[in-house]
Curated annotation (Swiss-Prot):
It comes from Synechococcus elongatus (strain ATCC 33912 / PCC 7942 / FACHB-805). PANTHER family: GLUCOSE INHIBITED DIVISION PROTEIN A (PTHR11806), PROTEIN MTO1 HOMOLOG, MITOCHONDRIAL (PTHR11806:SF0). GO terms for cellular component: cytoplasm. Its cofactor is FAD. NAD-binding protein involved in the addition of a carboxymethylaminomethyl (cmnm) group at the wobble position (U34) of certain tRNAs, forming tRNA-cmnm(5)s(2)U34. This is tRNA uridine 5-carboxymethylaminomethyl modification enzyme MnmG. It is found in: Cytoplasm. Disulfide bonds: none annotated. FAD binds at G13, A14, G15, H16, A17, G18. Its main location: cytoplasm. GO terms for molecular function: flavin adenine dinucleotide binding. PROSITE patterns: GIDA_1, GIDA_2. The gene is mnmG.
């Protein structure tokens, strides 16, 4: 009988979901094993080495506010940072960091190795140990090792049945240079899980020494660096590197159109769906045929790495055509290609088979997170990873699971979409996916998530003290701004009236001034009316709370109204086929996905408001009949 080691939680896969899951479980006191195919590729960024961007930055901030790691990693290893959408409202402000991929992987590996309760091990999991009551009991590896655990988290990324394509040539691989994981897909199918195929891709890398930078448009980082983490201990001031911008040409487009038949998608070699919001260059040329040019960003992969990432230029063209294609771009006429672009096709588990806790519906104690659930992006993976890690630990410890409501965070929006929508293409989080984005801003992620992180046990005393001090300073500044007044005839009052093209009648509070269009806290500071002792985040927090107070209150009222109705639980044994007043499609969808609440039911594709109304009426009729029976029995 082979020796079997025992743990509380086992995490399979050490990408961005696996790292967050393992750290969360270990920090919550569980003996945790993190199994990976390659100990030298932990926390690797195989595509664009970057963190953040629209909606993704909100996820990174939220993970950090809960006690996770991705934001700290970006703050420690960035090459460049920029705030996107800075000229628009705070709901869509987005911090983005270009990171050093080797440094990022080295730092996260060090964090994992130094984490108490966590052990790392190299191995390929091929089978799950399942108990008599459909509960997970552990895993076995390709070479026959067994590990027991009460909870297992699958975070296998693109490695299940992974196959990479360059033109019409393919090979089994989870990503370039790393073999695919075999056996686990068949295990999941045997257990009754539905699996399907998705694809993604990554562009070529070119030698930075072969590029003519004089023909590129520099894209410098912001002079004032912003941070993903709310913990100043993670902040590292460092020199920033520029990125660059070029554009496709008519020659680029012609070369692609002439050779579309040689790509794996247009040549018919694969039919898996790729990411809608990160299309290949050939998809762009086909879908936007009237567009004469597309922006292409040239981004460094590291301080000591000669490779440049060609963002927006992923392709499935054969390798011998890729260099010619790259050399049609201004500035890259003499470039040297170091790695070809490729597409990767892989197995995934549609996440409608998961509860909102990310535990699977079929097997108790089995959790699924990250790209395996059909998402794309490191931030989406990290968000799911920390949720799975938290809930796996709570499952092992006999505590109630944590469900993140969609109105409370982008994490909640992401997971609710995954668990209720029949998604058949890689899912990317977007600000437009949230109905409550004015409330779910990056700047207040700590206000929304850190109290929960503290309650769960991931926020220590030092972090909690930092949080309380920050909130107290914001509240005090709001009070000052609503009380301090500027008089009409004061020199500063006259200067502000001239600047804003609006008179001050008698006097106005600083809060009144902040409510004026295009007048901000930085303008108060210019007139000597700010508080120089406050941090930027505290100044912005006070300004946003005042400037957008009416909008925030209205949206919060909408949330409160929706929550009252949407959180109404649905019976787990509800027979949807009996609700004949509902359309057949809606009955079938509800029976298939088994939503836990009325809110979840309303967001399932194929279920419309009339169906929800019919469901409500049916529930009320059933409740009334039950009440009448109970009353009759009492009599």
């Amino acid at each position: 009988m082979p020796h079997t080691e025992e743990f509380d939680v086992i995490v399979i896969g050490a990408g961005h979901a696996g790292c967050e899951a393992a750290l969360a479980a270990a920090r919550l006191g569980c003996q945790t094993l993190l199994l990976t195919l390659n100990l030298d590729r932990i926390g690797w960024q195989p595509c664009n080495p970057a963190v953040g961007g629209p909606a993704k930055s909100q996820l990174a901030h939220e993970v950090d506010a809960l006690g996770g790691e991705i934001g700290k990693m970006a703050d420690r290893t960035y090459l460049q940072k920029r705030v996107l959408n800075a000229s628009r409202g705070p709901a869509v402000w987005a911090l983005r960091a270009q990171t050093d991929k080797r440094e990022y992987a080295a730092v996260i590996k060090q964090v994992l190795e130094q984490q108490p309760n966590l052990r790392l091990r190299e191995g390929m999991v091929t089978d799950l140990l399942i108990g008599p009551n459909d509960e997970v009991q552990g895993v076995t590896t390709y070479f026959g090792s067994s590990f027991r655990a009460k909870a297992v988290i699958l975070t296998t990324g693109t490695f299940l049945g992974g196959c990479i394509w360059v033109g019409n040539k393919s090979m089994p691989a989870g990503r370039a240079g790393e073999f695919a994981a075999v056996g686990l897909t068949e295990t999941l199918q045997r257990l009754g899980f539905e699996t399907d195929r998705l694809k993604t891709g990554t562009p070529a890398r070119v030698d930075k020494r072969s590029v003519d930078y004089s023909r590129l448009e520099p894209q410098p980082g912001d002079p004032e660096v912003r941070w993903f983490s709310f913990d100043p201990e993670a902040w590292v001031e460092r020199e920033q590197l520029p990125c660059y911008l070029t554009r496709t040409t008519a020659e680029t487009h012609k070369l692609i159109r002439d050779n579309l038949h040689l790509t794996p998608v247009y040549g018919g070699y694969i039919d898996a769906k790729g990411p809608r919001y990160c299309p290949s260059i050939e998809d762009k040329i086909v879908r936007f045929a009237d567009k004469e040019s597309h922006q292409i960003f040239i981004e460094p992969e590291g301080r000591d790495i000669p490779e440049l990432y060609i963002q927006g230029f992923s392709t499935g063209l054969p390798e011998d055509l890729q260099l010619a294609l790259l050399q049609t771009l201004p500035g890259l006429e003499d470039c040297v290609m170091l790695r070809p672009a490729y597409a990767v096709e892989y197995d995934y588990l549609p996440a409608t088979q998961c509860l909102p806790t990310l535990m699977t519906r079929r097997v108790e104690g089995l959790f699924s997170a990250g790209q395996l659930n059909g998402t794309t992006g490191y931030e989406e993976a990290a968000a799911q990873g920390i949720v799975a890690g938290i809930n796996a630990a709570r499952f092992v410890q006999g505590q109630d699971a944590i469900v993140f409501p969609r109105e409370g965070s982008y994490i909640g929006t992401l997971i609710d979409d995954l668990c209720t929508k029949d998604l058949r293409e890689p899912y990317r989080v977007l600000t437009s996916r949230s109905e409550y984005r004015l409330l779910l801003r990056a700047d207040n992620a700590d206000q929304r998530m850190t109290p929960l992180g503290r309650e769960i046990g991931l926020i220590d005393d030092r972090r909690w003290a930092l949080f309380e001090q920050k909130q107290a300073r914001i509240a005090a500044e709001q009070t000052r701004l609503t009380q301090q007044r500027v008089k009409e005839h004061d020199p500063v009052g006259q200067a502000i009236a001239q600047q804003t093209q609006a008179p001050i009648k008698g006097s106005a509070t600083l809060a009144d001034l902040l409510r004026r269009p295009n007048f901000h806290y930085i303008d108060l500071e210019a007139h000597g009316l700010g508080d120089p002792s406050l941090a930027i985040a505290e100044k912005e927090g006070a300004e946003i709370a005042i400037k957008y107070a009416g909008y925030l209150q209205r949206q919060q009222a909408q949330v409160d109204q929706v929550v009252r109705q949407s959180q109404r639980p649905l019976p787990v044994d509800l027979d949807y086929s009996a609700i004949t007043s509902m359309r057949l499609e809606a009955r079938e969808k509800l029976a298939r996905f088994r939503p836990l609440t009325l809110g979840q039911a309303s967001r399932i594709g194929g279920v419309n408001p009339a169906d929800i109304n019919a469901l409500l009426i049916w529930l009320e009729v059933q409740e009334r009949q039950r009440s009448q029976v109970e009353t009759a029995l009492v009599r």
